[in-house]
Amino acid sequence: MSKSENLYSAARELIPGGVNSPVRAFTGVGGTPLFIEKADGAYLYDVDGKAYIDYVGSWGPMVLGHNHPAIRNAVIEAAERGLSFGAPTEMEVKMAELVTNLVPTMDMVRMVNSGTEATMSAIRLARGFTGRDKIIKFEGCYHGHADCLLVKAGSGALTLGQPNSPGVPADFAKHTLTCTYNDLASVRAAFEQYPQEIACIIVEPVAGNMNCVPPLPEFLPGLRALCDEFGALLIIDEVMTGFRVALAGAQDYYGVVPDLTCLGKIIGGGMPVGAFGGRRDVMDALAPTGPVYQAGTLSGNPIAMAAGFACLNEVAQPGIHETLDELTTRLAEGLLEAAEEANIPLVVNHVGGMFGIFFTDAESVTCYQDVMACDVERFKRFFHLMLEEGVYLAPSAFEAGFMSVAHSMDDINNTIDAARRVFAKL
């Protein structure tokens, strides 16, 4: 047995499923998950000594690559002054100033410890600010594991949501309306059925949890218009897209102004950080200045703030996003060319430093139904063959891939060459 197999066997006796987040268990592709020893730049190194070109990037945060010296040094320096104080620090102020400067729609920001905390708190704030209970989310979009968000669509277009996890009371789920991503008609229908009851829409501007599905040109502006028409708030969940699709996020890339924004992943530079913020009048409703409660023992933790501050300063340097786009575009084009040579039907979506690989005969993938029609079994074979080639992709057909500026053009070309060999075997 390999060392990864031995560790996984031991882990399953001690940790549910052997992992601390379900997708890591390789249940979406089968087999034994890799246990990682270290990472540097664009590469992961497993406990058995094998290196992989990494397109998971810790599920998004590693836009600069692994073990970036500016972030590592910032963490070391901060740790020498203490790990946590439970009191305000200067770095919290500097971090808030940096974030609000980089994302102009955020007049104020509150730091938390995860993307789930950010979305959960933003929804509570929207409900408290509007005095309404219902929310709209989209089928196939993921916003963390808060009870109100673990909800799937009912049996009809306008039925109330149903829990998609045991432990979520139906009474919670009934306040969550699930609409179709990239379909404004389904959203209007929900508002027309509940015109005075919907507090907010929460949306991934690029749906990254049904692989990578960009918005149609009219979709995000249409959501903004519907929120204005019916008095609801628009929450854009940029946990995945923030500072990756563009410096000011996908909202800037697509030209839409939200009321609230949720951030995570890159904002922590690899440390556990989330944030939410937006309009000053809405944020003023948050405790201690307002009645909507939110708190956190480790929120604004000095180590995490130092890592995030260092990361964002690096990400804000000229040329970063142009490089991300160039690398991702080359990868997407190369994969499509290699698939065509092997007569493999393939769609590759990409925006900025995100991409998605779909084995499908369709010309495009624009919604959850399109994603579900893809050939998952072929993806599983593709994943394992690429792993044998030393390329680490997300171990699920429903998760986006992530580029970093640490990837070289040689890494990209080697990945395309590996895919060409793999396509010949599919």
Swiss-Prot record:
Chief place where the protein resides: cytoplasm
Pfam family, one: Aminotran_3
Cellular location(s): Cytoplasm
Keyword Protein biosynthesis found: no
Signal peptide range: none
Catalysed conversion reaction: (S)-4-amino-5-oxopentanoate = 5-aminolevulinate
EC number(s) from the headed UniProt entry: 5.4.3.8
Gene3D superfamilies per UniProt: Aspartate Aminotransferase, domain 1, Type I PLP-dependent aspartate aminotransferase-like (Major domain)
Modified residues (N6-(pyridoxal phosphate)lysine): K265
Family to which the UniProt record says this protein belongs: Belongs to the class-III pyridoxal-phosphate-dependent aminotransferase family. HemL subfamily.
Protein name, as recorded: Glutamate-1-semialdehyde 2,1-aminomutase
Organism: Salmonella schwarzengrund (strain CVM19633)
Taxon lineage: Bacteria, Pseudomonadati, Pseudomonadota, Gammaproteobacteria, Enterobacterales
Gene: hemL
